[in-house]
Amino acid sequence: MAAASSPPRAERKRWGWGRLPGARRGSAGLAKKCPFSLELAEGGPAGGALYAPIAPGAPGPAPPASPAAPAAPPVASDLGPRPPVSLDPRVSIYSTRRPVLARTHVQGRVYNFLERPTGWKCFVYHFAVFLIVLVCLIFSVLSTIEQYAALATGTLFWMEIVLVVFFGTEYVVRLWSAGCRSKYVGLWGRLRFARKPISIIDLIVVVASMVVLCVGSKGQVFATSAIRGIRFLQILRMLHVDRQGGTWRLLGSVVFIHRQELITTLYIGFLGLIFSSYFVYLAEKDAVNESGRVEFGSYADALWWGVVTVTTIGYGDKVPQTWVGKTIASCFSVFAISFFALPAGILGSGFALKVQQKQRQKHFNRQIPAAASLIQTAWRCYAAENPDSSTWKIYIRKAPRSHTLLSPSPKPKKSVVVKKKKFKLDKDNGVTPGEKMLTVPHITCDPPEERRLDHFSVDGYDSSVRKSPTLLEVSMPHFMRTNSFAEDLDLEGETLLTPITHISQLREHHRATIKVIRRMQYFVAKKKFQQARKPYDVRDVIEQYSQGHLNLMVRIKELQRRLDQSIGKPSLFISVSEKSKDRGSNTIGARLNRVEDKVTQLDQRLALITDMLHQLLSLHGGSTPGSGGPPREGGAHITQPCGSGGSVDPELFLPSNTLPTYEQLTVPRRGPDEGS
């Protein structure tokens, strides 16, 4: 019985390719409990049969054999030796262990939490840090007031201890978590991270706080005046709120975009400030106020007055005394104040445009997943008409591993726990079930009862190994009730559906269903893309209409240019000189003009030929008066046709004002008797 239940040698060799090497066989028990290894279900021959240990009698990925041919014994694949499996178990496709939270993974999550915050958890943490820093700053201000100095100083001392420990620990954690990025790996990478401006500020704040706490005595944070000067470094903690520097980047981008306007306004305003201060100084340098003091004793006093005036502050400490100085000050103030107020408007409009641009970018970014889904579904609809096997591989269920066949009883609770953990990881990473692009369902079929194999009974597994039925043969393994009564009731209540594990098991109704599902997914993706393309503001609608009108006008002008180039301008809108210039061009109008000129020349030549023929006829009639026939008016005689008497019939010719026909220009042929 033992020999019958064990697989053959060749088959055991093939199954051994999907297992761990000898150094990792200690995790075999874990592999039986957690069958979550990656499998090549779409690669290799027969849709991944190289790595899937399927029993010869089970409906696995092997293609069905002919009814008359016996089942061939399993043969090891000759695709070459197995690649080395010295990879980490988290990335190796031969590993049977579930991915664990390694050090690099924890580093990445901590780094994203601290340096690239996204989500409500990160917002709560960083907002709490901002509130703590703000409270510390408020107590620092209160410690300089005599009324609250005693209470604020004692409270601030313990707050400083907590903040120093907190920020020091956070700095060390940031330095450690930066190792998840390639440019911050190792000692030199950590030094590169520590050289960042915000990291330098954090280090200065921590060191300054430690110096303040170490030098202070008797619970007094500000023991000496020197330490009181270092205390102002605590204001740098407010920069800790915006570690990413988004506000500074936004301000820099606005200033860079409007740099030309800002430079122009500041330059003109500075010139107005210098000139107004100088002329006021010349007018007020000898003036004395009511207290007997000279207001503008130096040019520096005039510059101070100019800065206070043109910036609309107006302290009133220096005022012009003479009417000349007041007139100069009023004239230059109106001019200079207008230019000094322009940068505020320029920066305000720049910020508004930047915010609007970001909103449009967000609206455009929402269209990218919808467009990707539409392209993917359209391609799948197109690929559904292709009989290639790769089109249908995504609907094939991966074949079970060998340890799932050998397991004594199913464990549905395990799968539920794994699904919950997976959902939790996806939720932590910011992926919600509604944001997934497209789900590919697996196809199952409802086979007859006699085709169902018992994967939970060892006898059923042994019978499938001992006997390899063909397509027409049916294996009837006996079901062994090794489970409890409650589990048997659960198994009886569920409908067992055999998953399709090979392309050859797909039927026409399966393919038709797949086509219908793909077509429905295409229509849904198309509707979502159309909804994402809708403008979100009235200004966008107006801009779209104006942009469309501009494109229409450009196309109309291009069409008009091509028509003028091919047909030419109408004769009513061009002069004689332009007509003469247009004659040498290749337009249709120029060609028609040349054709008309040629027709006119041809008419003139034909008229000349007709006159010459009439003259010849008249001369011929005058030289043969006795040839017979009645004479014409004017002494001309009418001759007989050449066919009878050898003369030309004048009735064949028309008057000189008409064109001759083809018969008139054709010379009559002589008969055979006339030639002789």
Curated annotation (Swiss-Prot):
Outcome following mutation: residue 600 to M: In LQT1; uncertain significance
Transmembrane segments: 121-142, 154-176, 193-218, 227-242, 261-283, 323-348
Phenotype when changing residue 308 to D: In LQT1; uncertain significance
Effect of mutating residue 258 to R: In LQT1; uncertain significance
Impact when changing residue 224 to M: In LQT1; uncertain significance
Effect listed in the UniProt record for changing residue 277 to P: In LQT1; uncertain significance
Effect of residue 231 to A: Strongly inhibits SLC5A3 transporter activity
Regions annotated as coiled coil: 585-621
Outcome, altering residue 195 to W: In LQT1; uncertain significance
The protein, known as: Potassium voltage-gated channel subfamily KQT member 1
Effect ascribed to mutating residue 306 to R: In LQT1; uncertain significance
Effect the entry attributes to changing residue 302 to E: In LQT1; uncertain significance
Effect of residue 268 to S: In LQT1; uncertain significance
Effect seen on changing residue 611 to N: In LQT1; uncertain significance
Variant or mutagenesis effect after changing residue 516 to D: Reduced protein expression, probably due to misfolding and proteasomal degradation. Significantly reduced electrophysiological activity. Reduced electrophysiological activity in the presence of KCNE1
Organism per entry: Homo sapiens
Disease: Long QT syndrome 1: A heart disorder characterized by a prolonged QT interval on the ECG and polymorphic ventricular arrhythmias. They cause syncope and sudden death in response to exercise or emotional stress, and can present with a sentinel event of sudden cardiac death in infancy. Jervell and Lange-Nielsen syndrome 1: An autosomal recessive disorder characterized by congenital deafness, prolongation of the QT interval, syncopal attacks due to ventricular arrhythmias, and a high risk of sudden death.
